[in-house]
Amino acid sequence: IILLDNGTRATLPLSNMGGGMNAVGIGILYLVLGNMVAVFSDALVKVLEPDQPVFQFVFFRQLSAAILLAPWLLWSWRRNPPVALKWHLLRAHIWAVGVCLMVIALTRLPLATANALFYAAPLMMVPLAVWLAGEAISRQKVLTAFIGFVGVLIVLRPTEVNWAALAALGVALSMALNNLLIKRIPLQQPIAQTLFFTNVLSMPFIMALAWWEGGDWQWQMWWPAFGSSALIMVYAGLCVVAYRKAEASKIASAEYTGLLMAVAIGVWLFDEQPGLPLLLGCLCIILPLIAMARSKPKPQVEPAL
């Protein structure tokens, strides 16, 4: 749960790719690399101490994202003037709350546990899509969502639920809501603009929370925040390239290698020891997601980067 915000993508299938690796293989490779980058972004958040100011870090992260995305925004501004700003504003504030909860979760939970709970986002989208969008769902989706939520309970171990675990579920909820709200954004809107507005429009809100939080500004957090934002931008770019190379239904399951990488990086960098409940819960979460990813989506037009 992760975590990141590249919206609904369409598929532009390529009939032939020269060389030894086909389009599906290249797409999977990009997704695997992208998810590895995203886990390292989470690791940069995890190096923070739990008592460091959360809202300051989130503000630094938003500011660095705005700096990184500004050239793309200026380049696309004339061709694609910003639209649907009220929906961008709503998504930005939901995402800001989610990022604050993400910092709380990552600084207090093992990396793999936090990521396993973040992956509940696609599962949460199933009931939310029925409730908010009035979508009809199949029995298969109900069953896969149920199995996935069983996995979440196994990871959580209800007797050990704490605020950090609830924060991780809050991250998943914010991601699910934002994924549903992306449908309110015109498909022709460049992804860079969407990412820019998602970070910038909630900066006054986060700045006010940082002022309320009090204390001196800890500028040493700037570089972890900048690094985390930069890695997420790389992840978003790799995802766009991957989904342009091959059909989403054929490669989307590669996204879930991120959870395996979170386990590996947690062991390597933070001396975490994943137990059997975590591994079993991860399986219950990932397998339904793979089943959902393999169902054929309706073709859509992809926005330009």
What does each model-identified segment do?
Residues 2-30, 123-173, 187, 286-305:
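Juxtamembrane helix-loop boundary signature in multi-pass membrane transporters
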Residues 26-27, 51-97, 174-177, 196-212, ...:
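Transmembrane alpha-helices of multi-pass small-molecule transport proteins
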Residues 26-33, 73, 77-103, 163-171, ...:
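Loop-to-transmembrane-helix transition segments
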Residues 43-46, 54, 69, 159-217, ...:
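Transmembrane alpha-helical segments that form core, pore/gating elements
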Residues 66-84, 148-161, 202-223, 267-271, ...:
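Membrane-interface helix-cap regions at the ends of transmembrane helices
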Residues 104, 121-143, 260-279:
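C-terminal transmembrane-helix exit sites in multi-pass transporters
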Residues 115-120, 185-201, 236-268:
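Helix-helix packing/entry segments at the starts of transmembrane helices
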Residues 260-305:
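C-terminal-most transmembrane helix of multi-pass membrane proteins
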